[in-house]
C-alpha cells in the first residue's frame, strides 16, 4: 500500500481534540539527494520535516510558508525546513565535525529554535525565537507550542534515514470540553503507545484504528506533499541587488564571476559582468508583490 507523501487530518468527534498524520518518502529523499548527511543528521532533518508539515496543516497560512529552524552552538549548526501552505516542502542542514554517537542535545548544545510564519503577500512575517528545550525535535516543538502559543500539543516523530513520519494531537483553543472532560488525557494516553515502526509502516487509517479503535474519529481527505524549492535566477538576482552595485563589482573584479548554489536543491546560478550590469539597470521584482523601483 502506498502511504508516502501524504498528510491526513482527523478529528475526535464531540471533543476539542484534533490531529494529523504525515508520511514522507519521495519528498524526504529529494531533500537528501544532493547532500551527504550523516545518519543521525538525516534522522533529525526527517523529524523536523514531518513536524513542519504537521504544524503547517494546523495553521492558516493562506499562501504563505512556515519555516522551522534549529540553530545550534555545537557540531550541528543549522537545521531548516520550509513548508508552504499547499504542503510544498524543502530542507537542508549545516554541521561540522563528527556527529556519530552524539545525542541531539549534544549536537545542538544550547542552541535556539526559530519559527517563522511568512505570509508571502508583502505582510510582516511573524517570528518566534526560544532556547532549545528538550532532547528531541518533538520535545522542542511541544515546549514551544505550550510556552509561546499556549496550545496543548503532543507530537510523535520517526525517521529511519529513508522515510519520515509523524503524528500530531492538539487541543483546539477556545473549544469547550464539558461534554467529554477526560478526552484529552485519554487520547494522549492512547497515542503514547505508538511505536516508531508503526508511524513509518502503517497507513493513517490503520494507525488510527490501532490507536483509537474505541474513539469516534472523523478522517478527512488526504493532502499530497511534494518537494518544492522556490529558488530562481530572479530571486538570486534580487539578493545580489541588495548587496549593492559596488560590492558586486568588487566581487567580480576579484573572481570574474559570482557563483551561487542553492542550499536546498543544489541549483547553480552564475553571474558575470554583463549579468551584473543588467541587474542594476532593471527593476527589482519582489516575490508576491508588484514591481518596485
Curated annotation (Swiss-Prot):
The organism's place on the tree of life at top rank: Bacteria
Protein name from the UniProt record: 33 kDa chaperonin
Protein function: Redox regulated molecular chaperone. Protects both thermally unfolding and oxidatively damaged proteins from irreversible aggregation. Plays an important role in the bacterial defense system toward oxidative stress.
TM annotation in the entry: none
GO process terms (BP): protein refolding
Subcellular location field: Cytoplasm
GO MF annotation: an example: protein folding chaperone
Gene3D superfamilies: helix hairpin bin, Hsp33 domain, HSP33 redox switch-like
Amino acid at each position: 500500500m502506498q502511504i508516502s507523501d501524504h498528510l491526513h487530518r482527523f478529528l475526535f468527534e464531540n471533543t476539542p481534540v484534533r490531529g494529523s498524520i504525515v508520511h514522507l518518502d519521495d519528498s524526504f529523499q529529494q531533500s537528501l539527494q544532493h547532500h551527504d548527511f550523516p545518519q543521525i543528521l538525516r534522522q533529525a532533518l526527517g523529524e523536523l520535516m514531518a513536524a513542519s508539515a504537521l504544524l503547517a496543516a494546523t495553521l492558516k497560512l493562506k499562501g504563505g510558508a512556515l519555516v522551522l529552524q534549529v540553530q545550534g552552538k555545537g557540531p550541528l549548526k543549522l537545521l531548516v525546513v520550509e513548508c508552504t501552505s499547499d504542503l510544498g516542502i524543502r530542507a537542508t542542514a549545516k554541521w561540522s565535525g563528527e556527529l556519530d554517537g552524539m545525542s541531539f542535545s549534544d549536537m545542538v548544545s544550547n542552541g535556539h529554535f526559530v519559527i517563522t510564519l511568512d505570509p508571502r503577500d508583502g505582510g510582516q512575517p511573524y517570528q518566534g525565537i526560544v532556547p532549545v528545550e528538550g532532547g528531541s525535535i518533538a520535545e522542542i516543538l511541544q515546549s514551544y507550542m505550550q510556552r509561546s502559543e499556549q496550545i496543548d500539543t503532543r507530537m510523535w516523530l520517526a525517521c529511519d534515514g529513508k522515510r519520515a513520519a509523524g503524528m500530531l494531537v492538539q487541543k483546539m483553543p477556545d473549544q469547550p470540553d464539558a461534554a467529554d472532560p477526560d478526552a484529552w488525557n485519554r487520547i494522549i494516553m492512547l497515542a503514547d503507545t505508538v511505536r516508531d515502526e508503526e508511524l513509518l509502516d502503517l497507513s493513517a487509517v490503520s494507525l488510527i484504528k490501532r490507536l483509537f479503535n474505541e474513539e469516534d474519529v472523523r478522517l478527512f481527505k488526504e493532502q499530497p506533499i511534494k518537494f518544492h524549492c522556490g529558488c530562481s535566477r530572479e530571486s538570486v538576482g534580487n539578493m545580489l541587488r541588495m548587496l549593492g552595485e559596488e560590492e558586486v563589482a568588487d566581487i567580480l573584479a576579484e573572481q570574474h564571476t559570482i557563483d551561487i548554489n542553492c542550499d536546498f536543491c543544489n541549483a547553480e546560478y552564475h553571474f558575470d559582468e554583463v549579468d551584473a550590469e543588467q541587474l542594476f539597470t532593471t527593476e527589482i521584482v519582489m516575490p508576491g508583490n508588484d514591481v518596485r523601483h
